[in-house]
């Protein structure tokens, strides 16, 4: 059977045993990849600095997903929060990786068994003796089992009743830890940033799935609906399954890109909107203002800002700054962050405090402009010196650092002031090590960006696949060329055009 590459899956179209085999093999490949990728990431991951070199800066992709489900310790003796552990137990990062690889191997063997022993009695129709599947019944079984798993995850794992809970943090990603979560049954449960909604929605959706599964197991579909939706055709299953997958892919692409309780910034990095809206900058200024209100000096107030919070307020951690084909981690772009230099405050010779206008997300270069508290431009780094009116030299801009490594240090040298003004465009100023990884200085995206791009792309492809296979199963008779109302028996090969007696082939 000379099938083109895009039609090879027809070999399992009417072969339930081998259809099952290839799906088990697919599960083996998925689980095997997950386990292998986890081991690779653990081999290259450096857990020594969870504040300035967290998992998302290092380009970890599967470690954040394990962590948000409650895994925090390694058999290597380290914890994701920076401490050391003596008894991590079986469910460490390595334990999860190993269990996936073990499961993959078992699925591999099961796939081979089902490929060899394909002609099982369970796949045979008692009335006709031909291979067939009771698809509505199978749908009910799968719905019931997935509902059970969904309910169990929400009621036991997330709540901590039998399980660790999930990763929960504050709005600024500073105090995250794994903890049990109580279900949120009120209107607050619909807030995507409330962790309690994860528990309540899994419990509710799981209950619905269990009830719907029992319904489909006990009630047969009406004949008209069965025929109308082509429920006897395996391609209907393919089409509707693809629909479920692409819908889920669109949803998770959204929750990842825009942020939610399921995608904590400590594990996946901040969102681009937090940079666009000055989210962390506002919180930093609020904290400094609160410190000043308590009669602290500027230096004391800025010194109390957590380095972790300051690091979020840096454009290099914005996932939208990475280019489409810039492979690699954030660390291999602008370098490994070593320390916060402190917050620079610029002043002109009249003593006015000046603020550097920050670079918008989608700019690679941006003019250095310093404005006062009223938004009036007071200084800049001009493109043409001959025409300049507001140059650092003319205005007499000075800089002083508060907090961080340069706390209390001031500069009046124009070249130094301009250097730090350029860096202040990018948010808080950090010392970055570009030598260790030979970082090229070009921004990279975080796993948040990769996940979103991958899932949005595949969702679009799968949407097309749903339309394609849905059309094929609904209009199969039209595409085959056979009149559905044809009463006479059709002999394949007897006519040039299938089912058309006027095009009977001539005997040679």
Swiss-Prot record:
Cofactor binding description? Binds multiple chlorophylls. PSII binds additional chlorophylls, carotenoids and specific lipids.
Keyword list (alphabetical) reads:
Chlorophyll, Chloroplast, Chromophore, Membrane, Photosynthesis, Photosystem II, Plastid, Thylakoid, Transmembrane, Transmembrane helix
Q: Which family does it belong to?
A: Belongs to the PsbB/PsbC family. PsbB subfamily.
Q: One GO CC annotation, please?
A: photosystem II
Lineage, broadest ranks? Eukaryota, Viridiplantae, Streptophyta, Embryophyta, Tracheophyta
Looking at the UniProt entry, the stretches that span the membrane are: 21-36, 101-115, 140-156, 203-218, 237-252, 457-472
Q: How does it sit in the membrane?
A: Multi-pass membrane protein
Q: Which gene encodes it?
A: psbB
One family name in Pfam for this protein: PSII
Gene3D superfamilies cross-referenced by the UniProt entry: Photosystem II CP47 reaction center protein (3.10.680.10)
* Entry function: One of the components of the core complex of photosystem II (PSII). It binds chlorophyll and helps catalyze the primary light-induced photochemical processes of PSII. PSII is a light-driven water:plastoquinone oxidoreductase, using light energy to abstract electrons from H(2)O, generating O(2) and a proton gradient subsequently used for ATP formation.
Presence of the UniProt keyword Plastid in the record: yes
Task: Look up the record and give one Gene Ontology term from the biological process aspect.
Answer: photosynthetic electron transport in photosystem II
Does the record's keyword annotation contain Plastid?
A: yes
Fill in the subunit field for this protein: PSII is composed of 1 copy each of membrane proteins PsbA, PsbB, PsbC, PsbD, PsbE, PsbF, PsbH, PsbI, PsbJ, PsbK, PsbL, PsbM, PsbT, PsbX, PsbY, PsbZ, Psb30/Ycf12, at least 3 peripheral proteins of the oxygen-evolving complex and a large number of cofactors. It forms dimeric complexes.
By what name is this protein known? Answer: Photosystem II CP47 reaction center protein
Quote one Gene Ontology molecular function term. Answer: chlorophyll binding
